[in-house]
Amino acid sequence: MEDVLEVYTRPEDPQHPRVCMDELSKQLVSETRAPLPLRPGQPRRYDYEYRREGVCNVFLVFAPLLGQRWVTVTAQRTYQDWAYLMRDLVDVRFPGAERVTVVLDNLNTHVGGALYETFEPAEAKRILDKLELHYTPKHGSWLNMAEIELRVLNGQCLDRRIGDVRVVKRESAAWEAERNAAEATVDWRFTTADARIKLKRLYPVAQPENSPSTVRVKRNTAKLGPTEAALRTRRRAHKQTRGQHELCHR
């Protein structure tokens, strides 16, 4: 958690831009009956029945210091889709940057190995060398600013029945252009100091130097004089002696 929060405190640097990346799955749904038109005092009304048209995946890369975001809609979510997104990030969005810092969640497709699954080894290494990946902790995806932008995208644009992936692409592109023109960003205020106070329960409790548990560990450590080989010899001899005693008793 503190690793991600530290990234957010870094100053703007054109050679080391900072972005957040997230994705969501959008279910495609079409109408089975035409909606009833608007009437005075009544909104447009939709039938409760609908038809499933599959799903698509929506990637969003957000640069909070620039007030820019880029939406990519794909037919599915695979290693290759994420790999192409990362190549586009370093070659198209920030071609002159030395390294791009990316905050993202620990989804199974968000790994460097995805680049090697998609490109030749030399190309995969070239892309990976230009990326600095910082993963949010488990159950900590709220630390990703891109998740906030995805909520805005869904609430303003995609939270309705859409049955065609081409419509999703067109609507997302229009939303992206409008938000980028306004240079909308996220006013992030949660810091490491806040985390250590408000999320204190998540931190391990440090033991005092002379606490009973610390003293017990020291005593147990002091008793470990012999080497591991000597200890194994003792255990082996003990087993043999115990076996001989059992034979005598029989």
Report residues per predicted region.
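Extended, low-complexity cationic-aromatic segments
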Residues: 1-87, 199
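Mobile genetic element proteins and their domesticated derivatives, centered on retroelements
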Residues: 20-22, 61, 67, 86, ...
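Active-site proximal helix-loop segment of RNase H-like, two-metal nucleases, encompassing DDE(D)
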Residues: 138, 146-165, 178-182
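C-terminal domain-tail junction helix/linker
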Residues: 32, 167-234
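RNase H-like polynucleotidyl transferase catalytic core
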Residues: 45-50, 123-145, 162
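Short, basic/hydrophobic alpha-helical segments
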Residues: 80-101
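Acidic/histidine-rich, metal-coordinating catalytic segments
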Residues: 97-111, 137
